[in-house]
């Protein structure tokens, strides 16, 4: 289940070989959408969609509030927690933080979001979850730099 999403405004450096080697903390300074999931077994992992030059449009398939082409004044971020009851609507609109009672459940292969032109996705998980998913260091290394399509098995 999807637990929360964070839109983090940032820069739009190109995500190419030169930038990866020369721009310190490139993936941390570019604009990002961070989705935090919890598996049925309770393990958490994060999927980070990283914007880049010419790829400033990140949209989420399940929540229209997350559309990085809409630039709020002052470039404020946005955060939503799903599966929680909340009556803070006025405060939420002012702070950019929301809590939704309805949980979001994505099945394996479901579309989570899209880039208008494509960019980088970073998956963060602990070693135990990687082992359960049979993602060895060798298998992960073989995926570096390769394009991945929606629904494609890793």
Explain the meaning of each model-derived region.
Residues 1-154:
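Contiguous, well-folded functional domains in the mature portion of proteins
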